Amino acid sequence: MTQLYTYIRLLGACLFIISHVQGQNLDSMLHGTGMKSDLDQKKPENGVTLAPEDTLPFLKCYCSGHCPDDAINNTCITNGHCFAIIEEDDQGETTLTSGCMKYEGSDFQCKDSPKAQLRRTIECCRTNLCNQYLQPTLPPVVIGPFFDGSIRWLVVLISMAVCIVAMIIFSSCFCYKHYCKSISSRGRYNRDLEQDEAFIPVGESLKDLIDQSQSSGSGSGLPLLVQRTIAKQIQMVRQVGKGRYGEVWMGKWRGEKVAVKVFFTTEEASWFRETEIYQTVLMRHENILGFIAADIKGTGSWTQLYLITDYHENGSLYDFLKCATLDTRALLKLAYSAACGLCHLHTEIYGTQGKPAIAHRDLKSKNILIKKNGSCCIADLGLAVKFNSDTNEVDIPLNTRVGTKRYMAPEVLDESLNKNHFQPYIMADIYSFGLIIWEMARRCITGGIVEEYQLPYYNMVPSDPSYEDMREVVCVKRLRPIVSNRWNSDECLRAVLKLMSECWAHNPASRLTALRIKKTLAKMVESQDVKI
């Protein structure tokens, strides 16, 4: 029974030592020396069983660097072990120290394994002053897992750097090769212009090409490859106009004069919309500006948006009226041809090759051109709206541009126009057309009298009116351009006055349609025996 009790005591002591030694480092074990005042073994009292550590004899050990405060002549006393330890510090210098190690945990600490961060070796013995003769040596250098990881990362970083450098070299070679190729192709362009004529045979005129595309093509204009070829071959001659969208140049293609509208890059939406409208199926009409080609030209540092159309040397109706007067026949010819163009725009043509209805949205005298035969054609379709009755959708361009305020209808100025329906856009065009007829009528001579050219509302608003200016005059006061008394004394001008008044009515529903205007003017043309 006594032996069983002793074994239980020993097992408890071992568990206690293990639980404490695991949380302690070597230094804490070495500083506790188990110093005693004498070397005698403890005597057991009657009926008392001693622990194993209390029965062990005490040793005298040599101490250096680990001496307790009460050490005498570099000696210390312990019931554990004497030790000697050699350590290497962060600077690589070695230090040899000695001392006493207390009994508890000494067996574990004497088997201390070297750490990767700190190289050291400890040796122990159990006889008096035995550690004076111990000569521990440092363990060999071992590459730990941390150092292994550093090498692996270094290898990875070097590999990545090599790959990046290789990619940069490869990309540079590719870009240089591409640049050289583009330079050579650009050089070949000037030499190979003649080869482009394979698409356009020698002797073919623009009229021939357009007639062929109308009869054998889809009716939406020239093939894109032909358009691009024409755009490349055009020679710019001189600038003939400039506006908020860009510039207009007179150019030449194989000796034929053409108009080249060069859009600012900020007006790409206008260029795209106008090109789209012009290439609508069955869009071509004698009173709509003749579209030839569209292209984007650039070298990387700059971009030009080209729209190539027929060239009309008489310029716009605005320019023409400022320097020319009209007789009644010329007036009717201008008005009727403009009405025909507007009627074609507004009319939807049904069928598999049909045409949607189109509203202009920026009708004014500057956007109507004068042809050689004295008739008109409508231009500048960058703000146009399309409508297809099959889908019942109003196709409004994504464009920040707005129409000209002076020509805006009342419902546009007061923002009451229903943008979800197409008919209001048609009626707004009719209002603008009424103002254009007024501009023409002022320049018509009757009885030797004619007024000087003026813009609508010239005496009511500033030269560059604001929305508020126009809204006050047109919507609030409901004023319209002044009419000369002489108009009532002439049969033709009296009929024209009635027509324009029905065009600029305040209520959109009261305005005439483009077809009605066309038919009314046709009767007047017939009565005046005007040759169209």
UniProtKB/Swiss-Prot annotation:
Could you identify this protein by its name?
Answer: Bone morphogenetic protein receptor type-1A
Please name the Gene3D superfamilies in this protein's record.
CD59, Phosphorylase Kinase, domain 1, Transferase(Phosphotransferase) domain 1
Signal peptide boundaries: 1-23
Describe its function.
On ligand binding, forms a receptor complex consisting of two type II and two type I transmembrane serine/threonine kinases. Type II receptors phosphorylate and activate type I receptors which autophosphorylate, then bind and activate SMAD transcriptional regulators. Receptor for BMP2, BMP4, GDF5 and GDF6. Positively regulates chondrocyte differentiation through GDF5 interaction. Mediates induction of adipogenesis by GDF6. May promote the expression of HAMP, potentially via its interaction with BMP2.
Q: Which reaction does it catalyse?
A: L-threonyl-[receptor-protein] + ATP = O-phospho-L-threonyl-[receptor-protein] + ADP + H(+); L-seryl-[receptor-protein] + ATP = O-phospho-L-seryl-[receptor-protein] + ADP + H(+)
Q: Does the keyword Nucleotide-binding apply?
A: yes
Family assignment from sequence similarity: Belongs to the protein kinase superfamily. TKL Ser/Thr protein kinase family. TGFB receptor subfamily.
Where do the TM regions start and end?
Answer: 153-176
